[in-house]
Amino acid sequence: MATTILGVGPGVFIIAVIWMVTLMLTVLLCRASGKARFWTVVVFTLALITTLILVFFPRASQTPAPAKEMQIVDTFFIGRYFLISIMSVIFLGCLFFVFVYHILEPVYAKPIGIH
């Protein structure tokens, strides 16, 4: 079975593109003069026939093929733990600097004013 995008197959997108092009050509040809105006009927009929063919003669079966049992393998195991250890060291260093420069910041007494 073909891959799906947003839960639908590629046929839905093909039909959507066909009808968008049909709508665009119909609007453009309706503004035309002479015999070109009657091509709107031909464009609409071709889009309708193509849509019916795609709907009634699908290439894939209705029931999906049975899924194979997939084995999940963590190939980035060592790299993930290396990154988390580096991030932990950086976090602890930042906590140390917050402690030194923010919490232990000296509070100076205000000078007493003489009247």
From Swiss-Prot:
Alphabetic keyword roster: Cell projection, Membrane, Transmembrane, Transmembrane helix
Role according to the record: May be involved in ciliary biogenesis or function.
Protein's UniProt keywords contain Membrane: yes
Gene name of the record: tmem218
Family: Belongs to the TMEM218 family.
Subcellular location: Membrane; Cell projection, Cilium
Domain of life of the organism encoding this protein: Eukaryota
Organism expressing this protein natively: Xenopus tropicalis
Transmembrane residue ranges: 5-25, 38-58, 81-101
Protein name: Transmembrane protein 218
GO cellular component: cilium; membrane
InterPro entries, A to Z: Tmem218 (IPR026771)
Membrane topology: Multi-pass membrane protein
